[in-house]
Amino acid sequence: MTTNYAHYIDHTLLAMDATEAQIIKLCEEAKQHHFYAVCVNSGYVPVAAQQLAGSSVKVCSVIGFPLGAGLTAAKAFEAQAAINAGAQEIDMVINVGWLKSGKIADVKADIKAVRDNCAATPLKVILETCLLSDEQIVQVCKMCRELDVAFVKTSTGFSTGGAKEEHVKLMRATVGPVMGVKASGAVRDRATAETMIQAGATRIGTSSGVAIVSGQQAAASGY
């Protein structure tokens, strides 16, 4: 059976120097190729929502991005503001420093605060797996399952590494068959996308969506 790669793709542009014209182009590409969503910084949600109005492509906003180290109240507020501006999905970054400090209750409360402000809007929780041990990945995945979030997500694409097959497999094994798993960071071609899907990913975050659906090799840089 042929994989419908477009349905997996969150077409992504999160660079700090991304221009409005580039966001508009991102949205046009997403409509043309029928991607699942575009993923942008919260400040560009109104532009993306306007460009995608009337289409099937959803608007996803990152929150607390890329460090995840801000105040919990700020993350919760940003999530609600992004939803009010037109975001239909939210991707938040956990506080990795708190996790590594053993502040597990604070990490869970941080996720819960954003989840509570998302209401019915799907929440994806970014683990930044390149910075975590397998035990920590399992710990956060179990936490997210308990909090009934929609997805766990591998990476911001702004740290020391992106999605790895073994991490996606571990995340899938931990959360079970129903919860979403998003592989993001360094997924730049169809072969890598297929590897992630076979490992258990149900969404792919990438700036190389056009290359993936066309079967081409994308640039070595990019999300």
UniProtKB/Swiss-Prot annotation:
Entry's Gene Ontology cellular component terms: cytoplasm
SMART domains: DeoC
EC number assigned by the record: 4.1.2.4
Residue positions of the active site: 91 (proton donor/acceptor), 153 (schiff-base intermediate with acetaldehyde), 182 (proton donor/acceptor)
Pathway: Carbohydrate degradation; 2-deoxy-D-ribose 1-phosphate degradation; D-glyceraldehyde 3-phosphate and acetaldehyde from 2-deoxy-alpha-D-ribose 1-phosphate: step 2/2
Location relative to the cell: Cytoplasm
GO biological process: 2-deoxyribose 1-phosphate catabolic process; carbohydrate catabolic process; deoxyribonucleotide catabolic process
Keywords (A to Z) from UniProt: Cytoplasm, Lyase, Schiff base
Pfam families: DeoC
Catalytic activity: 2-deoxy-D-ribose 5-phosphate = D-glyceraldehyde 3-phosphate + acetaldehyde
Enzyme class: lyase
A single GO molecular function term of this UniProt record: deoxyribose-phosphate aldolase activity
NCBIfam families: deoC (TIGR00126)
Family that this chain belongs to: Belongs to the DeoC/FbaB aldolase family. DeoC type 1 subfamily.
Function (record text): Catalyzes a reversible aldol reaction between acetaldehyde and D-glyceraldehyde 3-phosphate to generate 2-deoxy-D-ribose 5-phosphate.
HAMAP family associated with the record: DeoC_type1
Alphabetized PANTHER family for the sequence: DEOXYRIBOSE-PHOSPHATE ALDOLASE
Protein name per the record: Deoxyribose-phosphate aldolase
Origin species: Yersinia pseudotuberculosis serotype O:1b (strain IP 31758)
Lineage of source species: Bacteria, Pseudomonadati, Pseudomonadota, Gammaproteobacteria, Enterobacterales
Underlying gene: deoC
